[in-house]
Amino acid sequence: MTRVFIANAKTEERSALRLMLLNLDLEVVGDASDWETTLVKAPATNFNLLLVDWDLLPANAVTSLSAMRQACSNAIIVVLTSYLDAHQQAAQSAGADAFISKGEIPNRLADHLLAISRNLNSYETTRSKNESESIPRSIL
């Protein structure tokens, strides 16, 4: 099962994402409203999918996402952004695996998240016994 951690400063957006994820039968294992809390709480939840709002990241997004990648190398990081074109290259450089525009209609957002979840679950079901093996970014 896909275990999702939500990192978003806005309570209403976290709540909406939580509801959508639960409706998609994805497990929400935690959330945080700031990056410092995310770095502390998220690794302890054993999440395998992090949804993070670009605006939540500190000024140096590359360093911030790199720290999360080091703590949780087997997780997929999906950046949610209001400005997909403007932030996509920066997010990719920072270590994000996927990008989703906050402007997407709910059904399209749900489709993106389900596709990521299916690919992640398929990989976890078939991966070798080497538990330390990182998730290939090509599954997205």
Q: What would you call each of these model-derived segments?
A:
Residues 11-30:
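Two-component/phosphorelay signaling modules centered on CheY-like receiver
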Residues 86, 104-114:
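C-terminal output helix
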Residues 83-100:
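Alpha4 helix (beta4-alpha4-beta5 surface) of REC/receiver domains from two-component response regulators
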Residues 31-49:
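Acidic, metal-coordinating helix/loop segments flanking the phosphotransfer/catalytic sites
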Residues 120-140:
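CheY-like receiver
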Residues 51-68, 84:
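Conserved phosphotransfer microenvironments
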Residues 74-86:
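A short, hydrophobic beta-strand element within the central beta-sheet of small alpha/beta folds
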Residues 43-45, 68-74, 94:
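Conserved phosphotransfer cores of two-component systems
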